Amino acid sequence: MHLCHAITNISHRNSDWSREVQASLYSLMSLIILATLVGNLIVIISISHFKQLHTPTNWLLHSMAIVDFLLGCLIMPCSMVRTVERCWYFGEILCKVHTSTDIMLSSASIFHLAFISIDRYCAVCDPLRYKAKINISTILVMILVSWSLPAVYAFGMIFLELNLKGVEELYRSQVSDLGGCSPFFSKVSGVLAFMTSFYIPGSVMLFVYYRIYFIAKGQARSINRTNVQVGLEGKSQAPQSKETKAAKTLGIMVGVFLVCWCPFFLCTVLDPFLGYVIPPSLNDALYWFGYLNSALNPMVYAFFYPWFRRALKMVLLGKIFQKDSSRSKLFL
């Protein structure tokens, strides 16, 4: 790998954008990074601190927040410099570490969403056996799979250069020799990345929420019909409405994920078959649109979960440092 800032004949790469545009991009990306760090840190602190939130499902949310926080802490700052400066300043080894960690954390976040959808499916569709099925051991297995599989896949592919099989020269001429550092895929590895990190988990999410929607809708009609018959309208609906609301909330999270990541993964799988015609700047922009997903998840919690808003207030006011604050009631 050559250092782009040291190669005089391609130094124009760094001046394609004016200082005003670069400053605007730095400001926008810094806001995304800040929102990702602050939002997910509050989720981590809240679930760790408040005993009422120590449920199997919330530990899955906790693990996903850690993934998104690490993405904002370890990956986004270097990606910001690479995107704005159109140059990788940190060397070839760190390029591989950055790329593999980026793919690992992005995929891990997606895996967590898939498992969260399965958890909600069990809660809504089989509530009587939910606690027996989804216990802490089950959640730990989900968390382990969500971290380990993306790690093996990402680091194995990048450090063994399996993603470059058959396109090594093209990668050198278009990326490496220009001092760049961005994910680059052959036709085979592009399809594999699309299937592993997007299509399979995304299909699981869509199928599960399709099932949840119709089953929850049917259960709600059945409960309302029963209550009308016995004259108990408005009663005995709280447990079901609580689970249905949780399912809708996580369904919105899945929708946000699909909107954020779908453009990037479509480009990833199509670009090798189109002869690598997608400009690096567009590819970078789509990657940042995917990063935005990690900043939006805590905002979904804040909008839909009253417990998160109460926890947020206590964290910001410093009330978590008071005695017995961990036993505070967040569910009214």
Curated annotation (Swiss-Prot):
TM regions (residue ranges): 24-48, 59-80, 96-118, 139-160, 188-210, 247-270, 284-304
Signal peptide stretch: none
Originating species: Mus musculus
Name of this protein: Trace amine-associated receptor 1
Membrane topology (Extracellular): 1-23, 81-95, 161-187, 271-283
Gene, per the UniProt record: Taar1
GO CC annotation: endoplasmic reticulum membrane; membrane; plasma membrane
Function text: Intracellular G-protein coupled receptor for trace amines, which recognizes endogenous amine-containing metabolites such as beta-phenylethylamine (beta-PEA), 3-iodothyronamine (T1AM), isoamylamine (IAA), cadaverine (CAD), cyclohexylamine (CHA), p-tyramine (p-TYR), trimethylamine (TMA), octopamine and tryptamine. Also functions as a receptor for various drugs and psychoactive substances, such as amphetamine and methamphetamine. Unresponsive to classical biogenic amines, such as epinephrine and histamine and only partially activated by dopamine and serotonin.
Disulfide bonds: C95-C181
Cytoplasmic domain ranges by topology: 49-58, 119-138, 211-246, 305-332
Activity regulation, per record: Activated by SEP-363856 small molecule: IHCH-7179 acts both as an agonist activator for HTR1A and TAAR1.
Recorded topology in the membrane: Multi-pass membrane protein
Protein family: Belongs to the G-protein coupled receptor 1 family.
Residues at which 2-phenylethylamine binds: D102
Gene Ontology MF annotations: G protein-coupled amine receptor activity; trace-amine receptor activity
